[in-house]
Amino acid sequence: MSIKRLSMRLKKGIHRSWNRMTSLEAGLEEEKEIKIVEEPEPRPWKVLITGGAGHLAENLVAKLEEMTRDSIRPKIREMLEKEMPAVISTKVDKEVEKRLPMYIQIVLVDVLEPRGRVLKHHVAFVKCSFDDECTMKTALEQVDTVYHLAAVGMTGQYARDRKACMDINAVGTMNLLIWARNSGVQRFIYTSSVGVVFSGEPMYNATEEVGYPDDFYNYYCESKAHAERIVQKASGHRMRTTVLRFNGIYGPGEKRVTERVVKFMLTGMWIATCKPNGVEAQTQLSSVANCIQGLVKAELALRWSDTPHGQIYNIMDKTPVGTFSFWTPLNIALGFSSSMITVPATPIRLFAYLSQIIADRMRIDPIVSVLEVDLLLVNNTFNIEKAERDLGYEPSVSAIPEIIEHYLHRLPPDVVRPKGRSDFYVKVAVLVLGTILIFVAVFSFTFWMYLIFQRLSRWNPF
C-alpha cells in the first residue's frame, strides 16, 4: 500500500472519528438539555383551607390557581418553543394544567362538601370538622400554609350554644395552631369579623388597636375574639400568623349577604331607608375580591422576615358608604323605583329584637339579627392604612357593578323587569300597616306580661 493511499485512509478515519465525536457531543448536549427540562421541580406549595365548602374558599382556590398558572406559564412556553414551535399556541395551556399539581396542591376541609367544579387533580377534599385531631393531623402533613376560614355560631344550632362556640371557635383554633406548628406549617392566616370589637356605639375610622368590648353581641363574636388573641400569641419563628377582620362579606354569588338582599329586592319591598337623627349611617363592607386580595397578600407578606407577624388587619372596601343607599343601584338595575321612604329606627330595632327572641325560643335562625340591624343603623367605618402599608393592600371601591352584571345575566328577564311595578304607594301602605301591627303586638305583649306579674305578686297561697 502506497503512502498516498495510507494517508487518505488515515484522513478518512480521522474525519469519521471527528464526526462521531461531534455526534456524541451533540447527543450529550441534547441529553443534558432534556435532563434539565425533566429534572423534578421543587416540592409543590401545599395549602390547607378550612371552611373549604364556602363561597370565600371557592374564590380563594380560583385565585391561587390563577397565580400559579401565571407563574409557570412563561417557563412552559419557553420549554415548548424549543421543542415544538409550530404548535406552541395550542400546547401551552394544556401543559400548564398538566403540570399544575407539581407547583400547587390544595386541601379543602369542611363538614359540607364543596361544589364539584372546585375539586380537581390538584384540589383534594377532607370531610371533617377542623377540630377533629386524628383527621387534621393527617391532612396537615407537608402543608406550608393554612387559611383558617371556618367557624360556627353565626347562624344555626350553635348560635345559641356558648360552650360549642367556645370549644370549636376558640379551643379548636388553638388546637389547630398546635397541630399546624408541629406539622411544619410556616404560615397561618385567620379570618375574623368586626363583630369582635363592635359594641353598638358609633365607630369612626376605627383602627386595629380598638379594644374588645366587655359584652359581646353573641357567642360567635365572643369566641372569635378569644380566637384572635390565641392566633396572635401563637405567632413565632417556626410559624408566623396573621388575623384579617372582614365586615359584611358581599359579592357576585355570595349567599349570606348579597343573595339575601337580592331576594328581598325581588319581593318589591325594598322601598324604605332609615336615617337615625336624620343622617344615614356609614359603613365599610368587604367585597369578596378585596377579601381574597387580603388573604393572598397576607400570605405573601409572611414569607418575608422583615414583615410584622402576629398582627391584626382591617380588610374592607376603600371608602365608607351609606348602609342603605349603597344597594340602591342594584335595586334600580332589577327594575324597581328609586323612590324611598324614611322610617324611624325604633320599629326596625323592635322587629329585630322580636325576631331574635322568637328564633331563640323556636331554635331557628332569625329573619334578621340585632347585630345586623345595629350595623345598619350605627356608624361603623374602619382604617385600612395598616394593611395598605404592611401587606400592600390595594382595595377596590365597590363590587356593585360586578353584582349587577352577575344577576342581570342569571335571572330570567321577566323576574328582573316584570311589568306592573308602579305600585309603590301600595307597598308603602303595607309597610306602614306592618309597622303598626308590630307596635300593637309589642304593646299587647308588654301589657299582658305586666298584668300577669301584678297578679303573681299579690297571690299568696298561704
UniProtKB/Swiss-Prot annotation:
It is found in: Membrane. Its EC number is 1.1.1.145, 5.3.3.1. It catalyses: a 3beta-hydroxy-Delta(5)-steroid + NAD(+) = a 3-oxo-Delta(5)-steroid + NADH + H(+); cholesterol + NAD(+) = cholest-5-en-3-one + NADH + H(+); a 3-oxo-Delta(5)-steroid = a 3-oxo-Delta(4)-steroid; cholest-5-en-3-one = cholest-4-en-3-one. The active site is at K224 (proton donor). One of its GO terms (biological process) is nematode larval development. Pfam families: 3Beta_HSD. InterPro entries: 3Beta_OHSteriod_DH/Estase (IPR002225), Lipid_A_modif_metabolic_enz (IPR050177), NAD(P)-bd_dom_sf (IPR036291). One of its GO terms (molecular function) is steroid Delta-isomerase activity. Pathway: Steroid hormone biosynthesis; dafachronic acid biosynthesis. Keywords: Cholesterol metabolism, Isomerase, Lipid metabolism, Membrane, NAD, Oxidoreductase, Steroid metabolism, Sterol metabolism, Transmembrane, Transmembrane helix. The keyword Membrane applies. Belongs to the 3-beta-HSD family. This is 3beta-hydroxysteroid dehydrogenase/Delta(5)-Delta(4) isomerase 1. It comes from Caenorhabditis elegans. The gene is hsd-1.
